UniProtKB/Swiss-Prot annotation:
Annotated disulfide bonds: none
Localisation: Membrane
Gene: ADIPOR3
Biological role: May play a role in abiotic stress response.
GO molecular function: signaling receptor activity
Residue ranges, Extracellular side: 95-209, 268-274, 328-331, 396-403
Name of this chain's protein: Heptahelical transmembrane protein ADIPOR3
């Protein structure tokens, strides 16, 4: 009896172990990669990518799959890395705004001025300038300061005697040794004076259009990366993620217009507001259209590509207008060259996306790496990065010249 009971217990253990092994196999098969033909209809998007699909995995496994190999791995990381690139660029740009003078860089003013509170002196100088006959024209000083960016001579109208007059009249209780000040010291002081009054007379232009573009780029890249990571979880989450992805594309295209339009036409408010309003309305309309359920169907791939390409191509109008107004400005030509290059990146990306090249030529050969959507992602990041450099040119141009 005891022996029989022992055999029954042992048999039960073996049966339990076998059940656990089969359950483990079923779990691994369920969370394994499948072929295109095994996908539900809502996940079928590109019939030329044949294998390595994740299909309706639980959310924890979906999140962890960012660090495993499947046919969406590079789609996730190309735009996630792009997001962090633009995050760093945004932080860098925010630290480069020329909004105050570096008082530590002044060479001779602290030696010549008694008990110098340089921040207070900066305000006193600007307030006093209009009272001096030779320096009352603040617009002339602004123009000279702007031209000094590309000139060896700083403030040519501020001669030695005018400088002495400025210091003795505007800072009578601070300035001493006027007759003992050498020409070399006066020249250096002249540069210091220019450095002090420049931020008060020449304010940096608004940065919000540039930050709007950077925000649109980061939103697009992060939304795209998240979409490619999470859409395999369920039909509902795929529905939400795809619309977020399309909204990100529209946001990137729309906000890409903001820097060139605002900085090109900031002195022409009518055209500036007209172009900004048109592209904003077009972007909102595109997002609304993308909410339609049929918009995500595979047969609408070409329509999606044409819609986004047409939205971007509408930027040709303000670019041509800019060239008509500023054909003599090197900055206008420089920014246009960047914009043409950006358009090439985006245009080629849209073409690759719509035609599904190269995987349509060799189905199954580019499942993991090299298929069209990955190339499209790389071209989008390249186009946005090119546009970032165009924006830097606009900022420097308008900071120096204003209207």
């Amino acid at each position: 009896m005891a022996a029989a009971a022992g055999e029954e217990v042992e048999a039960a253990r073996w049966a339990e172990a076998e059940d656990e092994r089969k359950e483990g196999l079923r779990r691994r098969r369920r969370y394994g990669l499948v072929e295109y033909r095994a996908l539900p209809g809502y996940m079928r998007d590109n019939e030329y990518i044949l294998r390595h699909y994740r299909c309706e995995w639980p959310l924890p496994q979906v999140l962890l799959s960012a660090f495993s190999i499947h046919n969406e791995t590079l789609n996730v990381w190309t735009h996630l890395i792009g997001f962090f690139i633009f995050l760093v660029l945004t932080i860098y740009t925010a630290t480069q705004v020329p909004n105050v003078v570096d008082l530590q860089s002044l060479q001779h003013l602290p030696d010549v001025l008694r008990n110098a509170d340089l921040h207070k002196i900066q305000t006193e100088l600007v307030a006093c300038l209009p009272s001096l006959p030779h320096l009352s024209d603040l617009q002339k000083l602004k123009d000279e300061l702007k031209s000094s960016w590309n000139s060896i001579e700083v403030l040519p109208s501020l001669s030695r005697w005018h400088l002495l007059e400025l210091l003795s009249s505007c800072l009578p209780h601070r300035f001493t040794h006027s007759n003992e000040t050498s020409l070399s010291v006066l020249q250096s002081m002249k540069e210091d004076i220019a450095n002090m009054i420049a931020p008060q007379l020449i304010r940096p232009i608004p940065r919000w259009p540039f930050y709007a573009f950077l925000g649109g780029a980061m939103f697009c890249l992060l939304a795209s990366s998240t979409c490619h990571l999470l859409s395999c979880h369920s039909r509902r989450l795929a529905y939400i993620m795809l619309r977020l992805d399309y909204a990100g594309i529209a946001a990137l295209i729309a906000t890409s217009f903001y820097p060139p339009v605002y900085y090109s036409f900031m002195c022409y408010p009518f055209f500036c507001n007209l172009y900004l309003s048109c592209i904003t309305i077009l972007g909102v309309a595109t997002i609304a259209f993308s909410l339609l359920p049929v918009f995500q169907n595979p047969e609408f791939r070409t329509i999606r590509a044409c819609l986004f390409f047409g939205m971007g191509a509408s930027g040709v109008i303000p670019v041509i207008h800019k060239l008509i107004l500023f054909w003599h400005q090197p900055e206008a030509l420089h920014t246009t060259a960047y914009e043409v290059l950006m358009g090439l990146f985006y245009g080629i990306g849209a073409l690759v996306y719509a035609t599904r090249v190269p995987e349509r030529w060799m189905p199954g050969k580019f499942d993991i790496a090299g298929h069209s959507h990955q190339l499209f992602h790389v071209l989008v990041v390249a186009g946005a990065y090119t546009h970032y450099h165009s924006g830097l040119v606009y900022l420097k141009w308008r900071d120096v010249q204003g209207c």
